[in-house]
């Protein structure tokens, strides 16, 4: 039995309106069930609880509540089939979630519902082919890869004392130092027995290079300036004076990896590699993927800023704002649960009411939706498509890189689980391909 009839379809500037007449039999049955639910605990003098005759109970019902509950029940029943109607499913501009719902007719005999589905706005994207200051996508260089390998070796290195020499680049200086600004000690720039690798650029310009040549027991004063872009607002560009004493000099003694010892350097999840060459092949793939991801993320921040500053949409669909703001709130509640902090306490610590947080989320949601709509529009213009082959290839690549030694059965299960999140994987690939295309235009 068809639960409803699609009576009329009207496309407006911002919405697609569907007029839906609920099947008469379904409407009657739904009212009967809701009547039973509402009267099962009803109390009337002379009858036991729940034993009031239906014909008598109906006279005591709130008719508006009965119709409201019945309407919600049929909406819940028909909504998913309604989303599969060709007029919605075949139109990629229709936003399926959170339609506005109204009633053309609602009484004991008839129920005609109006569903207003938001439409994706039509607009021209900003000039995405000439965004300044984007970084090109560059393959992993040998020196970058060797540095990552060396970092693995360094983790197994041993510190040895070399205090009988003058401090040089790459040495580890053990220092006591006091920083003063305007003649007053700055606690955040003061420490004892601090281990500083010379050349690491961990401190402000001139500090590390100013220590080179010192010997243990030497004292030195450095007059420097905090950089103009220093993170502490009150210290930006200010002169600072450091009194420093060198207490010890250390070096990291490193044994290079080779075929006989490489497994000693690898964590448990990589012990399945049978040769150093085999590990290096895998590790190169891993480091390359991470470098690409960092490049895409850094560029994505700049692309987003450009789009938000240069995009004017005719409107932003309320349904998308609600969808995104709800997602943000769920993520915030999940984070509180992860840290085992009551959500209300987290709000109190942030000095925000729930209403204030939701308003902030709505503002962020508007920006997120705007960015997503522009990226989708560019993907359409550039005819960027993601088919099942690309989705399967992406899933296989993720499993191969993240889980190199899972057995075939577990790999099959992981593939199946990720395939259940097909829409999410598709959105990631589409975003990556679109970001890559924008970078290529702007860096060539």
Swiss-Prot record:
It is an enzyme of class 5 (isomerase). Its main location: cytoplasm. Residues 170-255 form the PPIase FKBP-type domain. Coiled coil: none annotated. It is found in: Cytoplasm. The keyword Ribonucleoprotein does not apply. GO terms for biological process: cell division; protein folding; protein transport. GO terms for molecular function: peptidyl-prolyl cis-trans isomerase activity. Involved in protein export. Acts as a chaperone by maintaining the newly synthesized protein in an open conformation. Functions as a peptidyl-prolyl cis-trans isomerase. Belongs to the FKBP-type PPIase family. Tig subfamily. Consists of 3 domains; the N-terminus binds the ribosome, the middle domain has PPIase activity, while the C-terminus has intrinsic chaperone activity on its own. This is Trigger factor. It comes from Mycoplasma pneumoniae (strain ATCC 29342 / M129 / Subtype 1) (Mycoplasmoides pneumoniae). The lineage of its organism: Bacteria, Bacillati, Mycoplasmatota, Mycoplasmoidales, Mycoplasmoidaceae.
């Amino acid at each position: 039995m068809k639960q409803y009839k699609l009576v009329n379809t009207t496309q407006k500037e911002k919405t697609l309106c569907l007029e839906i007449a609920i099947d008469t039999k379904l409407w009657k049955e739904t009212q009967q069930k809701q009547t039973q639910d509402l009267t099962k605990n009803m109390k009337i003098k002379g009858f036991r609880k729940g034993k009031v005759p239906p014909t008598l109970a109906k006279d005591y019902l709130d008719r508006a509540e009965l119709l409201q509950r019945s309407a919600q029940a049929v909406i819940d029943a028909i909504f998913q089939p309604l989303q599969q109607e060709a007029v919605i499913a075949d139109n990629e501009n229709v936003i399926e979630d959170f339609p506005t719902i109204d009633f053309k007719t609602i009484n004991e005999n008839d129920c005609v519902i109006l569903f207003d589905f938001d439409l994706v706005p039509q607009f021209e994207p900003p000039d995405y082919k000439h965004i300044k200051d984007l970084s090109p996508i560059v393959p992993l260089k040998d020196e970058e890869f060797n540095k990552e390998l060396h970092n693995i070796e360094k983790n197994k290195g041993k510190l040895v004392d070399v205090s009988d020499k003058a401090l040089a680049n790459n040495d580890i200086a053990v220092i006591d130092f006091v920083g003063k600004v305007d003649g007053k000690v700055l606690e955040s720039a003061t420490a004892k027995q601090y281990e500083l690798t010379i050349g690491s650029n961990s401190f402000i310009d001139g500090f590390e290079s100013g220590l080179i040549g010192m010997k243990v027991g030497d004292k030195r004063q450095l007059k420097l300036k905090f950089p103009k872009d220093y993170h502490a607002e009150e210290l930006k560009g200010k002169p600072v004076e450091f009194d420093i004493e060198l207490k010890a000099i250390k070096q990291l003694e490193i044994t290079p990896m080779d075929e006989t010892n490489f497994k000693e350097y690898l964590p448990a999840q990589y012990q399945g590699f049978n040769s150093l060459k085999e590990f290096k092949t895998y590790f190169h793939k891993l480091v390359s993927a991470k470098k690409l991801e960092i490049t895409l993320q850094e560029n994505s921040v700049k692309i987003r800023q450009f789009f938000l500053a240069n995009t004017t949409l005719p409107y932003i669909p309320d349904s998308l704002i609600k969808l995104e703001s709800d997602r943000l709130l769920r993520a915030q509640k999940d984070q509180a649960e992860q840290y085992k902090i009551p959500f209300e306490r987290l709000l109190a610590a942030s000095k925000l009411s729930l209403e204030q947080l939701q308003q902030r989320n709505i503002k962020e949601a508007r920006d997120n939706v705007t960015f997503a709509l522009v990226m989708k529009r560019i993907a359409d213009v550039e005819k960027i498509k993601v088919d099942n082959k690309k989705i399967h290839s992406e899933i296989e690549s993720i499993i191969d890189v993240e889980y190199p030694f899972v057995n075939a059965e577990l790999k099959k299960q992981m593939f199946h689980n990720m395939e259940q999140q097909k829409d999410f994987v598709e959105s990631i690939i589409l975003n990556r391909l679109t970001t890559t295309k924008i970078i290529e235009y702007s860096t060539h």
